[in-house]
Curated annotation (Swiss-Prot):
One of its GO terms (molecular function) is ATP-dependent protein folding chaperone. This is Chaperone protein DnaK. The keyword Chaperone applies. Acts as a chaperone. Belongs to the heat shock protein 70 family. PROSITE patterns: HSP70_1, HSP70_2, HSP70_3. Induction: By stress conditions e.g. heat shock.
Length: 642
């Protein structure tokens, strides 16, 4: 059985790990880095760039470079969070036919799972290169506060990338796994504060040794799926744009390329301010108007930046309070506070966490890698390699159905340990009603419309009867991925209807299949492109070396031979401009054959030179030896025999 890898599919950065010989290992990507920017670029020639190469070209290709796709995954176009992002993102977000938020790049309409699949594919490839074998299975992490649609969409992304997603687990839980197994510090209750690039989660987790088994039980979880490092960057961008407009009278928000440069600079400045008290944002030629080019140079102090994001940090504290209350634990019960996510490197965030929990957060957990490591550990548990770990996670939000009067009746309460199932019997609202619509909801509000609609289905052929008489049993079943399966059964007839919630939005099976095929076709295209580039590089290298050799030794071969080489060179130079791999390889071979005579002459000359040099060295060595002769007398020493 192959390895099950662990992938932290992040908003800003992603990471992949695997357990080898019982130890988790974070795998470096093709560029040699342990984390990969979750950035995807669609370039003009059809190539798709992922990670650092995509980030490098973002300034010149802002409309076709997608970042933070995770903020859109499993979301409706009408969601207020999506509407907010439409104004901030340089790329186009549009409403898909199913009502979801999709992205438009180069006349293609792409679903967020399709875009995220490109990042997952890069993670998969990194793992395959490291392990030297094909990888087909993965554990992928999601924010604990992701709803059902977002979890399902993440699973779809895995499928499109060619991965069987063995389990979706919550990021704070994964971080707790990494921490608990690395430290082995006995029974404890920990708080995991996870402030990533686009999402915030907090989980209260109990770690216990039960009969030699490490048990990780999530007591509660809370969070905000639209609060993260990207929002901190945006505050800094907004401030710089406002100040620049005051000074120069130019609105940088109207210049997409300038905004992209500013985004990169703001992210860099934010990171610098975690270790320095002041930094400078310096962007020459940021834009221009009728008076000429404009340069941006602005000093930002740590205190100023902290004042810009003060309310964002405060927003993360309320979920901590709720999580503690839901877990039924007090601050004094918390042994350790673990920080996860790159944004937790900000000193002000650390201070706020310390102030709330009353203790110094642990600094011995890598905030960028802990989640992927935990996912890899869970992968080793699922593959049977590790048998001493038990993970008990929870559903983050309550689940129920809409009932008479537009209210939500909860069947499963938030923070219930999963997998779990619950059922309740309902009846009809009208006389002689022959069908009921089961409208599935997720959330905490009493009013049905105020909660997240996960989907609906019908149960028909109910025998006519007065209202309140038919007995319809609705069963909710949440699997270990936190994904919901719902069934409804008429107790009188035994007739049943059921669905795996794909949300009223989400991708259909046919769409996923199409995207899987597209991805496979892309992989084939990528392979062909790689082969073409390799052939072209080989041919260009050959052309260069033969031109050089012809210049140095061309006078040593006959005119016919020289003309033959020059003709082959010309043909090869012409063909490398095209995209025909076979033609390039053929002309390179012809050139190599045509220049054989030249090669022989060069080889013979090199041998002659080496021989001459060797002879000279020997003669020189002989002379040196003559001058170093030492006269000595030898005396035989006889040992006395016993």
């Amino acid at each position: 059985m192959g390895k099950i890898i662990g992938i932290d599919l992040g908003t800003t950065n992603s990471c992949v790990a695997v357990v080898e010989g019982g130890n988790p290992k974070v795998i470096e990507n093709a560029e040699g880095n342990r984390t990969t920017p979750s950035i995807i670029a669609y370039v003009e020639d059809g190539e798709i760039l992922v990670g650092a190469p995509a980030k490098r070209q973002a300034v010149t290709n802002p409309k076709n470079t997608i970042y933070a796709a995770k903020r859109l995954i499993g979301r409706r176009f009408e969601d207020k969070e999506v509407q907010k992002d439409i104004d901030l993102m340089p790329f186009e977000i549009l409403k898909a036919k199913n009502g979801d938020a999709w992205v438009k790049v180069r006349d293609q309409e792409l679903a967020p799972p399709q875009i995220s699949a490109e990042v997952l594919r890069k993670m998969k490839k990194a793992a395959e290169d490291y392990l030297g074998e094909e990888v087909t299975e993965a554990v992928i992490t999601v924010p604990a506060y992701f709803n059902d649609s977002q979890r399902q969409a993440t699973k779809d992304a895995g499928r499109i990338a060619g991965l069987e997603v063995k389990r979706i687990i919550n990021e704070p839980t994964a971080a707790a796994l990494a921490f608990g197994l690395a430290k082995q510090e006995g029974d404890r209750k920990i708080a995991v504060y996870d402030l990533g690039g686009g999402t915030f989660d907090v989980s209260i987790i109990e770690i216990a040794d039960v009969d030699g088994e490490h048990q990780f039980e999530v007591l509660s979880t809370n969070g905000d799926t639209f609060l993260g490092g990207e929002d901190f960057d945006q505050r800094l961008i907004d401030y710089i744009v406002t100040e620049f407009k005051k000074e120069q009278g130019v609105d940088l928000k109207q210049d997409v390329m300038a905004l992209q440069r500013l985004k990169e600079a703001a992210e860099k400045a934010k990171i610098e301010l975690s270790s320095a008290t002041q930094t400078e944002v310096n962007l020459p030629y940021i834009t221009m108007d009728a008076t000429g080019p404009k340069h941006l140079a602005m000093k930002i102090t740590r205190a100023k930046f902290e004042s810009l994001v003060d309310d964002l940090i405060a927003r993360s504290i309320e979920p901590c309070r709720v999580a503690l209350k839901d877990a039924g634990v007090s601050l004094s019960d918390i042994t350790d506070v673990i920080l996860v996510g790159g944004q937790t490197r900000m000193p002000k965030v650390q201070d706020a966490v310390k102030e709330f929990f009353g203790k110094e957060p642990r600094k011995d957990v890598n905030p960028d890698e802990a989640v992927a490591v935990g996912a890899a550990i869970q992968g080793s548990v699922l593959s049977g390699d590790r048998k001493d770990v038990l993970l008990l996670d929870v559903t983050p939000l309550s689940l129920g159905i809409e009932t008479l009067g537009g209210v939500m009746t909860k069947l499963i309460q938030k923070n219930t340990t999963i997998p779990t199932k619950a059922s309740q019997t309902f009846s009809t609202a009208d006389d002689n009603q022959t069908a009921v619509t089961i409208h599935v909801l997720q959330g905490e509000r009493e009013k049905a419309a105020a909660n997240k609609s996960l989907g609906q289905f019908n149960l028909g052929d109910i025998p006519p009867a007065p209202r309140g008489i038919p007995q319809i049993e609705v069963e909710f079943n949440i699997d270990a991925n936190g994904i919901l399966h719902v069934s409804a059964k008429d107790k009188a007839t035994g007739k049943q209807a059921n669905i795996t919630i794909q949300a009223s939005s989400g991708l259909s099976e046919a769409e996923i299949e199409r995207m899987v095929k597209d991805a496979e076709a892309n992989a084939e295209e990528d392979k062909k492109l790689h082969e073409l580039v390799t052939a072209r590089n080989h041919a260009e290298g050959l052309i260069h070396s033969i031109k050089k050799s012809l210049g140095e030794h061309g006078d040593k071969i006959g005119a016919d031979e020289k003309a033959k080489i020059e003709s082959a060179l010309k043909e090869a130079e012409e063909v490398v401009k095209g995209d025909d791999k076979e033609a390039i390889e053929a002309k390179a071979e012809e050139l190599a054959k045509a220049s054989q005579k030249l090669g022989e002459i060069m080889y013979a000359q090199a041998q002659a030179e080496a021989g001459a040099q060797g002879g000279a060295e020997q003669a020189e060595a002989g002379k040196k030896d003559e001058g170093n002769v030492v006269d000595a007398e030898f005396e035989e020493v006889k040992k006395d025999k016993a």
